[in-house]
Design a protein with these regions (language model features):
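Generic hydrophobic transmembrane alpha-helix motif, especially the helices
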Residues: 81, 85, 91, 115, ...
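Glycine-rich helix-loop "coupling/hinge" segments at transmembrane-helix boundaries
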Residues: 143, 154-157, 184-185, 233-277, ...
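Lipid-exposed faces of alpha-helical membrane segments in multi-pass integral membrane proteins
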Residues: 42-56, 108, 112, 116, ...
């Protein structure tokens, strides 16, 4: 291949992949009426509803979530739509206020995981060599531990609090971003237009940002959504075990921990927090799985081909 042809091909393909956000969003809009698109919109709608519920908690909650408003274990009915827990607190009010903690931890933990795992995956996959081997060894060592168990150990070391729990969960999911991004980068860097850009002496940073990153960008929202769903369950598990938040802060996992032993006498105090954990987790999973079908059509076709051949 002549240098001029290589330069032209790299430039043309660079323009094609140079705007990942716009291309991904346009592709999503085209597929928004498909089955996968409908699933994504359902998930987004549920997540947005929970976000607005958390933001408007001071106006939506009928009672103070930490105030005793009736006799303990009063069943649902009348002014107490979801009943009263064993502490005499309104379950509905604690559900509404308790949405704030999972959402805050999702935002912080997934952002930290993305901010660390993405550049490490790009660097490891593109540079290779000794750096790649070291990073893979470290990430595989972290990934080998069960997520909740590792989060428990980290939370026990660094202590309670929203930020500390977010950091503990973030550390658990950094290897997920790293592994997926690294594998994609290892494939993309072998493409002719990337090799042409390198042969022309283009700086590595520019090659990564202009040619490599746009081609792995479709994986980011998928990983982000799935990890967000996992973060909800991990946060609930930590607070259930008493490793999450200080007492007195409304939280769905803490409410389950507080009331589960009295399930037969006041099932509502455990059922409704668990139900909202299930709803939020399912909604985020809908978003992740739907985006995976929309943004990774080659993977979908490959899976279909493998199924047919089997």
């Amino acid at each position: 291949m002549a240098v001029g042809d290589a330069r032209g091909r790299a430039t043309i393909l660079g323009r094609f992949v140079g705007r990942p956000a716009g291309r991904l969003f346009a592709h999503f809009l085209r597929e928004s009426k498909s089955a996968a698109g409908i699933i994504v919109w359902i998930g987004i709608g549920i997540v947005l509803a929970i976000i607005f519920m958390a933001i408007l908690a001071p106006f939506l909650a009928p009672f103070d979530p930490n105030t005793k408003v009736a006799n303990p274990e009063t069943p649902p009915g009348g002014a107490f739509v979801m009943g009263i827990d064993r502490s005499g607190q309104d379950v509905l009010s604690r559900i509404i206020w308790g949405a704030r903690i999972p959402l805050a931890i999702i935002a912080v933990a997934t952002t930290i995981s993305l901010a660390i795992g993405l550049p490490m995956g790009l660097l490891s996959g593109f540079v290779g060599g000794r750096l790649d081997r070291i990073l893979v060894l470290v990430m595989d060592s972290i990934y080998a531990f069960p997520g909740l168990l590792l989060a428990i150990v980290i939370a026990a070391i660094i202590g309670r609090g929203v930020l500390n729990i977010s950091v503990a969960i973030a550390i658990v999911y950094i290897p997920t971003y790293f592994r997926v991004i690294r594998n994609h980068v290892s494939q993309v860097k072998q493409e002719p237009y990337v090799e042409a850009a390198i042969a022309l002496g283009m700086p590595r940073r520019r090659v990564i940002m202009r040619y490599v990153l746009p081609n792995v960008a479709q994986s980011i929202p998928v990983i982000f959504s799935v990890n967000a769903a996992d973060s909800v369950l991990t946060e609930a598990g930590l607070t259930f075990l008493g490793l999450g938040l200080p007492p007195g802060i409304p939280d769905w996992g803490f409410d389950i921990s507080l009331n589960w032993q009295r399930f037969e006498a006041s099932w509502w105090a455990t059922f409704y927090p668990g139900l909202f954990i299930l709803i939020l987790t399912t909604a985020l999973t809908f978003v992740g799985e739907g985006l995976n079908d929309i943004l990774n059509p080659l993977l979908r076709k490959r899976d279909l081909k493998a199924t047919v051949e089997a």
